Amino acid sequence: MTANDKKQLMVAACKVRMNVIKGVHAAKAGHPGGSLSAADMFTYLFCKEMKVDPKNPKWEERDRFVLSKGHTAPGLYGVLAHQGFFPEEDLLTLRQIGSHLQGHPNMNMTPGVDMSTGSLGQGISTAVGMALAAKYQGKENRVYTLLGDGEIQEGQVWEAMMAASHYKLDNLCVIIDNNGLQIDGKVADVMSPYPIPEKLQAFGFEVAEIDGHDFEQIEAAFNKARETKGKPFGIIMKTTKGKCVSFMENNAGWHGKAPNDDEYAQAISELQAQLAEVEGM
């Protein structure tokens, strides 16, 4: 990765985070914490990794993305708007009646959304089905799915993992956002899924553990995923819930709460300062 590539990704991630804050503030509802923790991954996927076309969202040869942790839709919408799938001003209609941007992704309403999700544990199952279908059809499409570490407390996740390994889905990349927090507190206290890497390996996955805010590590993991044959690939990314907004970081209270006007102003100010710093690099 060149220095300029890294800079452009960092700039994009700052803008995606601002989009998240703008959307949930306008809606007065939503899930900023997990959207911000995954913002760097959203950015890398849609700006560099995936084969997609904003002008033709239903392009048959595109790669597929399934947001299994569907409540973090503001993060997905933030990057889709940034990439031109729809106008950024649409973000201000989040969760409104008649808007194509609802609280959870809807594949029939939002350009760039490949699967309607929200019921935790089900997204990965549909991603496995997409990857298996691509294999049967002899297509080169890759399938990516993003889960939360709290989400993997759901039993259905592990049935899907078992199927992915059984069918040798090396076109599937399962990404787990390990920010350590869920709505009720620490994931380890609610129902510990740890250690995650060993569990994925036991289910037949090749695994990479990375810093989910380091673009070089993200790129290295995806390069390894493309080189892996005969088995699915899992990326466990260590992240910070509420990343880049000081009062939201590592605070489970921001799992599903919108900022008020003062908090919004502070969050945007912090992100604008970070953007200016990155652009000046």
Predicted regions and their residues:
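Glycine/aspartate-rich loop-and-adjacent alpha/beta segment that forms the canonical ThDP
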Residues: 205, 215-281
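Short acidic, glycine/serine/threonine-rich loops at helix termini
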Residues: 77-78, 106, 156-158, 184-188, ...
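N-terminal capping segment at the start of a domain
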Residues: 12-29, 177-179
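Thiamine diphosphate
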Residues: 112, 116-119, 124-228
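Cofactor-binding active-site loop characterized by glycine-rich and histidine/acidic residues
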Residues: 20-24, 35-166
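Short secondary-structure boundary/capping segments
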Residues: 83, 190, 249-253
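Glycine-rich beta-alpha junction loops
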Residues: 71-72, 76, 179-180, 214, ...
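N-terminal hydrophobic or amphipathic helices/low-complexity stretches enriched
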Residues: 1-16
